[in-house]
Amino acid sequence: METAEKECGALGGLFQAIVNDMKSSYPIWEDFNSKAAKLHSQLRTTVLAAVAFLDAFQKVADMATNTRGATRDIGSALTRMCMRHRSIETKLRQFTNALLESLINPLQERIEDWKKSANQLDKDHAKEYKRARHEIKKKSSDTLKLQKKARKGKGDLQPQLDSALQDVNDMYLLLEETEKQAVRRALIEERGRFCTFITFLQPVVNGELTMLGEITHLQGIIDDLVVLTADPHKLPPASEQVIKDLKGSDYSWSYQTPPSSPSSSNSRKSSMCSLAQPATTRLSSVSSHDSGFVSQDPTYSKPPSPMPSDITSQKSSSSASSEASETCQSVSECSSPTSDWTKAGPHEQPSATTLQRRKDRVEHLRDTEPGPTGGGTVGSSGEEVPRTRMSPATIAAKHGEEVSPAASDLAMVLTRGLSLEHQKSSRDSLQYSSGYSTQTTTPSCSEDTIPSQGSDYDCYSVNGDADSEGPPEFDKSSTIPRNSNIAQNYRRLIQTKRPASTAGLPTAGLPTAMGLPSGAPPGVATIRRTPSTKPTVRRALSSAGPIPIRPPIVPVKTPTVPDSPGYVGPTRAGSEECVFYTDEVASPLAPDLAKASPKRLSLPNTAWGSQSPEVASYGGGAAVGLATEDEEQQLAANRHSLVEKLGELVAGAHALGEGQFPFPTALSATPSEETPTPPPAATSDPPAEDMLVAIRRGVRLRRTVTNDRSAPRIL
């Protein structure tokens, strides 16, 4: 009995120890759960960071694939590595979700259940133990009473005593068994907690193992990358193939830089020069409808630092730009398509140094260029053959006297005075802006945008009385600036809003083919808009890049002999604002000329005459072959007479800039000078009508049928 009691006491103590252990484990479980929650939060942040990292990694891989130097093998390997990392990131996301859904949340719920179950076990065990102990105590007391009676010898009590002792022993055995069952339940409860924890942990570990299994695939990829990038200083065959393929391709690189800083903040010429402009975002085939000129072709864009391949083009461009400077510098340095427009214009430089440099340049080109042996041509690819011209020595030899050395200075002074007029006001025109406006991309006076596709031509004269007068005495390819004093005379006659000008590619053809009225005289300069099949493209405000600005061209026309054998009525070789005339006897190179840049056609010829050797570069080289000795002498005389009149034009130009209009009497003495008639003899010198007389006479527009809302409305 005592032994059984001791065993029951030992079992009860064991049960109580187990229950106490379970109760003391609650803080540990709760701490684990909180730490798991923190891990889950960090893993979520890691997943987001991994997604951003892999997006950037993918861009690097794509760049390696598209870069010529990295080769596609490196890019492909990087792409595969990025894909493996994305798979790892997916498994990491699954592991993070499993950590929260399979471990943290269920474990938190089970901890509460475990607390309840442990308390219930303790209560049940205590209740059973007390009941058993109470029964044993009661039975034991009865047994003691029987023992006392048996000792006194009262009756036969021994069988009852033995039965009572057996009942007490049975009760102790029952209590012992009850304690053992209680201990088993406690052990099962404690074990069940860890089994449940393993059940919760299994999905988390499985997700982690799957994620780590993806990492093993990175070994082969990194081995391939190490082999591909073993020698960074040696080009692989794929990169060598890029160089070989480049030889047969046609590339034209354009290097463009922002223009110089504006002189004042109020100037419309100020541009966003502080912003980096894209190099080739402007389409070279799209006409600039609101600025009045065609965008610069990348073929003619010259880099700031010339490469070896540009040496020949620079030579030809210097030859082309020197033609206008030989006869009074009517075209500034930035008007040539191949000139560097990032340099300051002639109005931004000191006048003394500009004139001296131009004079030295003219003298140098006169000394180095050959005599007039043939006319140059302009090919479709933009390359120019150096054009020949009659040197001053040849003119002096044929004319009989030497040209005055001050003629060149007078010409440059006159041209500079006329070219500086475009600085006075640029509010009404976008021709001198850099291609953007504060409100709209159309001109300020235009009411609508001009689509690239049109169905008609609008033709209006800028030559005054076209019905009674002959060819004008200024160049037919001149472009009148909108904001000069010349344009002010036009505005007096046109009391309407300024139309948005258009520009396109010139096409060669006869006047009838271009829509010119048959009754129009050959000297009427027209501005016509040609229908285009290109889609409507509006110029962007600032993404189109800087636009080279061409200063106004005000050339002087040298009179020619209408009855000379080589003289034929001029024909159209251009269209729109770049109006140009050539002879009907032009060589077959004229169609190729029409395909060239319109700005190339806008350059006036050197002699400003229709029969000079320089015209052969525009209208073909056949004029030189047909010219006779008498014609050359007549041309020399015409040029000399033009130089003599330049002195008088200087005073008139300065007076014109001040608002006065004094004109030499020699230029407008007789009406026959304004309306020249064919002389009876080819050797007679026809009087010259200069540009100032045409300005004084004014301009009269001819009505045409058009439905273009941007065309000028003649009141």
Swiss-Prot record:
Top-level lineage group: Eukaryota
Compositional bias (Basic and acidic residues): 360-369
Keywords recorded for this protein, A-Z: Actin-binding, Cell projection, Coiled coil, Cytoplasm, Phosphoprotein
Domain IMD span(s) in chain numbering: 1-249
Modified residue annotations for Phosphoserine: 261, 404, 542, 564, 575, 587, 597, 602
Record's compositionally biased regions (Polar residues): 331-341, 443-455
Span list, region Disordered: 253-405, 420-485, 527-562, 661-690
PANTHER family for this protein: ACTIN BUNDLING/MISSING IN METASTASIS-RELATED, PROTEIN MTSS 2
Cited function: Involved in plasma membrane dynamics. Potentiated PDGF-mediated formation of membrane ruffles and lamellipodia in fibroblasts, acting via RAC1 activation. May function in actin bundling.
Protein name per the record: Protein MTSS 2
Taxon lineage: Eukaryota, Metazoa, Chordata, Craniata, Vertebrata
